[in-house]
């Protein structure tokens, strides 16, 4: 019937409009979620230390994939290291960044430098870290520098004493940073005041920050 066809045609047009409206709504939510994730990523500093191609021998031949060692930090004392593996380089970097954010830890700092000298070790990697005076800058090379910069350290002296392997150096640097303690923690542990425990340099820096 012509009337029925017109009614059916009108109903199908309305359905199409409703579907288009729903798709636009869903797309808007996805866009908002994607923009929110991009804003969260933009708040952090990301450094790719190394990318390697690895292979796996299977029955049909070799399967190649990529690994990425990524450092992520907020530049304000939070830093993390992640290791990602995927068939494509961008996916490996993304996985490494996600793992790095899960491994965040806080680095105790006073006036832009670390609180005391430490030595970090991981496998054959050995990294020595020392506090530095304001204006010194980040004296570090190789794979240790991205870790210190992402953590927000402004003045530090470092030296690699062991293997030059980037993975070992990064994890040795992280091990050293995790050994750092605040002067308040040392004073509480020893049952003394901060003035009795902390060096004069740290006390002057704390006084300058409070002022």
From Swiss-Prot:
Give one GO term, molecular function aspect: rRNA binding
UniProt keyword Ribonucleoprotein present = yes
Q: Start and end of every S5 DRBM domain?
A: 44-107
Entry keywords, A to Z:
Ribonucleoprotein, Ribosomal protein, RNA-binding, rRNA-binding
Query: Could you mention a single GO BP entry for this protein?
Result: translation
**Do you know which InterPro entries this protein is assigned to?**
Ribosomal_Su5_D2-typ_SF, Ribosomal_uS5, Ribosomal_uS5_bac-type, Ribosomal_uS5_C, Ribosomal_uS5_N, Ribosomal_uS5_N_CS, Ribsml_uS5_D2-typ_fold_subgr
Q: Which PROSITE patterns match?
A: RIBOSOMAL_S5, S5_DSRBD
This protein's source sits in the domain of life called: Bacteria
Q: Where is this region: Disordered?
A: 1-41
Question: Mind naming one GO cellular-component term on file for this protein?
Answer: small ribosomal subunit
What does the entry note on its domains?
The N-terminal domain interacts with the head of the 30S subunit; the C-terminal domain interacts with the body and contacts protein S4. The interaction surface between S4 and S5 is involved in control of translational fidelity.
Which family would the database say this protein is a member of?
Answer: Belongs to the universal ribosomal protein uS5 family.
Function, as annotated, reads: With S4 and S12 plays an important role in translational accuracy. Located at the back of the 30S subunit body where it stabilizes the conformation of the head with respect to the body.
Describe its partners and assembly state. Part of the 30S ribosomal subunit. Contacts proteins S4 and S8.
UniProt protein name: Small ribosomal subunit protein uS5
What is the protein's species of origin? Corynebacterium glutamicum (strain ATCC 13032 / DSM 20300 / JCM 1318 / BCRC 11384 / CCUG 27702 / LMG 3730 / NBRC 12168 / NCIMB 10025 / NRRL B-2784 / 534)
């Amino acid at each position: 019937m012509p009337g029925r066809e017109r009614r059916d045609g009108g109903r199908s047009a309305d359905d199409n409009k409703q579907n288009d409206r729903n798709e636009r709504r869903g797309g808007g939510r996805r866009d908002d979620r994607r923009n929110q994730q991009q804003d969260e990523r933009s708040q952090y500093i990301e450094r790719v230390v190394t990318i390697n191609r690895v292979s796996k021998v299977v029955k049909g031949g070799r399967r190649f994939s990529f690994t990425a060692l990524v450092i992520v930090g907020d530049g304000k004392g939070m830093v993390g290291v992640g290791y990602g593996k995927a068939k494509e380089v961008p996916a490996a970097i993304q996985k490494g960044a996600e793992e790095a954010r899960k491994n965040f830890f806080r680095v105790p700092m006073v006036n832009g430098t670390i609180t005391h000298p430490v030595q970090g070790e991981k496998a054959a990697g050995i990294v020595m870290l020392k506090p530095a005076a304001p204006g010194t800058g980040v004296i570090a090379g190789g794979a240790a520098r991205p870790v210190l910069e992402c953590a927000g350290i402004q003045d530090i002296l470092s030296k690699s004493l062991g293997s030059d392997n980037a993975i070992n150096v990064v994890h040795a640097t992280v091990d050293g940073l995790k050994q750092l303690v605040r002067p308040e923690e040392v004073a509480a542990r020893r049952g003394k005041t901060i003035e009795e425990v902390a060096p004069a340099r740290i006390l002057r820096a704390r006084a300058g920050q409070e002022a």
